[in-house]
Amino acid sequence: MSSSVTSTKYVLNSFNSVPRLSYAKSIDIKDSLTDLIKIQRDSYNAFIGIDQNTESGIKNIFQSMFPIQDLLGRAVLEFVSYSIGEPQYDEYECIKRGITFSVPIRIVLRFIVWKVQEVSFKEVKYVVDEETSEKSIKYIKEQEVSIGDLPTMTSHGTFIINGIERVIVSQMHRSPGVFFDSDKGKTYSSGKLIYSARIIPYRGSWLDFEFDIKDILYFRIDRKRKLPVSLLLRALGLSNNDILDTFYDKIRYVKSEKGWVVPFVADRFRGVRLSHDLMDSDGNVLVKANTRITLRMARKLANDGLTKYLVPFNEIQGLFIANDLLDSTGNALIISAGENITSEHINKLELFNIEEIFVLNIDFLTVGPYILNTLFLDKNVSYEDALFEIYKVLRSGESPSLDTIKAFFDGLFFEKERYDLSTVGRIKLNDHLGLNVSEDITVLTKDDIIHVIKKLVLLRDGEGSVDDIDHLGNRRVRSVGEFIENQFRIGILRLERMIMDYMSSVNFDNAMPCDFVNPKVLATVLKDFFSSSQLSQFMDQTNPLSEVTHKRRLSALGPGGLTRERAGFEVRDVHPTHYGRICPIETPEGQNIGLISSLAIYARINKHGFIESPYRKVDKGVVTDKVEYLLAMQESNYYIADASATLDENNQFVDDMLYCRHDGNFVMVKREEVDYIDVSPKQIVSVAASLIPFLENNDANRALMGSNMQRQAVPLLKADAPLIGTGMESIVAAGSGTVVLAKRGGIVHRVDGLYIVIRAFDQEKNEYLGVDIYNLRKFQRSNHNTCINQRPLVKPGDYVKANDVIADGSAIDQGELALGKNVLVAFMSWQGYNFEDSIVISSEVVKKDVFTSIHIEEFECVVRDTTLGPEKIMRSVPDINEDSLSHLDDVGIVNVGAEVSAGDILVGKVTPRPPVSLPPETKLLVTIFGEKVFDCVDSSLYLPLDVEGTVVDVHVFVRRGVEENDRSLLIKQNEINGFIKERDYEIDVVSEYFYDELKRVLVSSGVQYNNQNIDDYLASIPKKEWWDINLSDEAMLLQVKDLKEKFDSMIQNAHSKFDQKIDKLNYGYDLPQGVLCIVKVFVAVKHNLQPGDKMAGRHGNKGVISRIVPVEDMPYLEDGTPVDIILNSLGVPSRMNVGQILETHLGWASVNLGKKIGHILDNLDELTVSHLRNFLYQVYDGQDLKDNIQSMSDEDLLVFAERLRDGVPMAAPVFEGPKDSQISNLLRLADLDVSGQVDLYDGRIGEKFDRKVTVGYIYMLKLHHLVDDKIHARSVGPYGLVTQQPLGGKSHFGGQRFGEMECWALQAYGAAYTLQEMLTVKSDDIVGRVKIYESIIKGDSNFECGIPESFNVMVKELRSLCLDVALKQDKDFLSNEVKD
């Protein structure tokens, strides 16, 4: 397929982001970047099928499974059609309820029972219809049957399983087909290459072929014991003669008076040293003996007319006879096929007067005797013996009949039920072996196996080369649709077996199709896959970029893939075919490095699972706009130029010679020979890496860290798009699913914090399309506890086009990805507080909540029905004073908006307890004072100790059939009010449009009523009565009638949707067994920046905040502006991520240009708009936007300039960033020093630093490694079973490890007692820590240290090595040692 290259024009409106000053030279193919999760969506759609007419995975599975008939053939169950229903609840309702977002699958089955005369164990005699001569039907029953629910993909490419969003990661695995390989000389010390071949199916047994050190060819099935390949060939039905005929050419030798006359073939004499004179058939010597003949010499002899040459009688000794040689009677065998001709055989030839023989073309140079040698290992084995030998290896211990063995062998490779190459495997096999077998034949054929052996023998003979398994032509991607299809097939096969079993025992007369199908079978298989598969992963929802990246991830791990322990360096390494397909940068840093990767920006996956990359076609040195997608295998045949190649105004290459990629190498070719050119310099990298400006100036390791850390950035309180971006920010935001995109074009009717209502309207056709209502997500919790909050960008009256961003999400600013903040940074050391990547920040940053983030914590309270009675939610909790309950409502549930802190009750709950007998004095007090005695215990939901925040939402789920409490009813009523609001919005928009249209029609009719103008008359009556006005014009009457029908239909549709929502709400909740009610409380926690939090830039420059310095102590500029962050300049040279410095300089220019524009705007009394326009010309010099600025009105120009006050947004695309001279020009334009350095003053003493400092604006991110989530305290806690040392980590409530270096520190300062305390009682001295506990209770501060348990463990380990070590504590023992 091909697409075209396009560019866009900026449109000034309130909801578009400010255009970036871009340094990109290439033109993007925008249509390839509009849908970043197309891979997931297309794969799933291919599985379910858009409609019944298209081929789909589901349809193919049903067609392959049915018809099913019983064992005796009395009845058959046929598949007619399938249908996929609508989900019961929408995506967010499923998340809220904690259920799976799924659709019901129903199939129409036809059950046919035949009329039978007689049934026996061997056969069934049917009643035959006399007219059609076919079996008579007793009856047919057709019914629609449910086979279960299928988890369905959300609009964002995810799955919601039990209320949790999950992603099915695509898997890279070895493509089905045949692969040829060698051991690279590693198996044997001699270094001899051992060649092998492997046929890998999509489903079924693997077939391996391999040589041994003696050049005998063997085969294996499923990696079992190897057998000679001649056994396999005989099992395929080939005799010895057939095998020799198949693998060797024959040479005819005709006897003459002077010797044997042989046809002369020039290629057979290449590199041969003659053992005898080369003579023609007449005996003339052409070449003397011992001469080495070259191919050129041989071909000259052929051209000179040599067609036959003479071989002396004795020179045939050592050749191999091609077939069985019989005497003239045909009874006596002289020489067997394949035998080596000896002197004895030559005498026999003379004796029997043999005039003609055929020998095998084996010269030991270009053709070796490998198949022949293998054949002689088991020369006399028959077809039956071969089958039995193969069966014995695969199924040892069994001795079945020959028919069973044949059926078993056929099922291994030749039956669709047990073996499937898949279409991909067949295509690869055909390409590799040069076959022309139909793609529909997805099992092996005899020819396939023979051709694989032939090619393997050719490899051993030195022809051809082995395959590169890491080449992307040999690896394919399995996406979500394929995984679900495989699981679906497993479930359906289980269902088929159950149907077969049921058919054998059911009475057909009473059976219906629904009796055969158990819907739980399929549901169980799908549930297991989505819940526990290695490739079904909890979605990374930290920020929009992490969502997109997770959906575009490729994993080599998982079922059928590699394991991280066995994966070598080669499979992890970057391969030349990854160019434009898999990102060479983005991969994890740990043990999964290279095994998990990301798809490149423009790459797509074709229907066979291979990755394609786009290129622009080049025709005779001219670059066209036609874009073609190429596979890795296709790409190696072409010369492909780099996107940075210089073009003239006619799109022709300027240079005569260009560097091009060809077959994995870089070569210099003429421009006329170039076939394609890259579409963009950034097509090599992934989405995350494409967001790093000046990527080309960073070391690859740091770029890897930068792309990974962007995915860890926490969405901040107020999003701020980067001043220095790459131009990909808006594309990533739109493709993430976090923003709200307009489904259709139209006019914004109403906007508030919860809804956007758009009157969908086609401006070109002037056609009304309906009403689109968008519900905005407010303060919802993501998978990683970050806050999802959508904010509208549009205002009433705005006209939006389809796919315009109408509402921002978390970490989105004006439709652009905004993961961090633009902050003023100085590169310098400061009192040692930024040593080793530590970061010093200003208190002003904390005060202004620059890096403050909101996190949503979810707490759940479950009310159960116990054996003593039901638990209850109530406000009057035992032994809790009223002040502690002030934030609860009358029911006992916390109010939304309440500020809660550690230990506060969120839900008051009591649990019944067994009755206790009260002592007499208590009974007396109860009688006198009437005190209530609680027969229950407090089991309320308390806020954990480390949480403090504001309650933002409460969900109450009451079991269907259980009486709802007041809070539950209130929440339900609020939801109903929301539905009413939506319905009324829709009716208002529909009514407004249709009444306007009706009025237009009535006014155009020109009629008058009661001598009134039509406008006045319409204003005097209710709008409902407008429809009843009589019109004399028939055409207008029909027009009004048509409007009325459309109006009624849309109003009815709005009411119908409202009723459906109410029905679903009133349906109630299905809760687990024994659960009466579930209350979920969501608390918004505010995390301010503090020491210990981790921050990073986009260039891998990460660090931990060491100190928050008062703003008055921070270094400041000449104008008094204090810097926000101080970074250590020593962190740049060794890391080689210079991109951060270039970003700093460009950011410095950007902000100061904004200040200059702001100064012009503030002084418009003195300066004119033309002055502003001229300055913007200089800023956007050479940009497409320059034309837009020229065409803007003065009013629009002022609006546009106002948005540039905080800085001019710039784009430095990957590999197309601005040059040093361009950055210098911008600094000069902003009246700055071109060095990018300024004088800084010490905030503590006010003196200027000795030398200038690099200062500028850099985009910093706050990562989700927050100190609040990591720090914890331990007094007592769990200990390890063996070592008896405290466990580690917050989740285990562990201690802090006092490690080797810490021990050195104590030793260095002579703190012996402190060191002893650390290694014993505070660690694993079991007796000592019990004693110290006792002494604390007694108030005694003294303690003794004993023997740590780790010493005892060491002693035990020494004993296991037969070394008995004992610890003596007796004083006499020491004195005896001294005496000795």
Swiss-Prot record:
GO MF term set: DNA binding; DNA-directed RNA polymerase activity; ribonucleoside binding
CDD domains registered for this protein in UniProt: RNA_pol_B_RPB2
UniProt-listed Enzyme Commission number(s): 2.7.7.6
A Gene Ontology BP annotation from the UniProt entry: DNA-templated transcription
InterPro entries the UniProt entry points to: DNA-dir_RNA_pol_bsu_ext_1_sf, DNA-dir_RNA_pol_bsu_external_1, DNA-dir_RNA_pol_su2, DNA-dir_RNAP_su2_dom, DNA-dir_RNAP_su2_hyb_sf, RNA_pol_bsu_bac, RNA_pol_bsu_CS, RNA_pol_bsu_protrusion
A Pfam short name: RNA_pol_Rpb2_3
Catalytic activity reported: RNA(n) + a ribonucleoside 5'-triphosphate = RNA(n+1) + diphosphate
Class of enzymatic activity (EC top level): transferase
UniProt entry keywords in alphabetical sequence: DNA-directed RNA polymerase, Nucleotidyltransferase, Transcription, Transferase
Family listed: Belongs to the RNA polymerase beta chain family.
Function as written in the Swiss-Prot or TrEMBL entry: DNA-dependent RNA polymerase catalyzes the transcription of DNA into RNA using the four ribonucleoside triphosphates as substrates.
Subunit-level organization: The RNAP catalytic core consists of 2 alpha, 1 beta, 1 beta' and 1 omega subunit. When a sigma factor is associated with the core the holoenzyme is formed, which can initiate transcription.
PANTHER family attached to this UniProt entry: DNA-DIRECTED RNA POLYMERASE I SUBUNIT 2 (PTHR20856)
Name of protein: DNA-directed RNA polymerase subunit beta
Organism, scientific name: Ehrlichia chaffeensis (strain ATCC CRL-10679 / Arkansas)
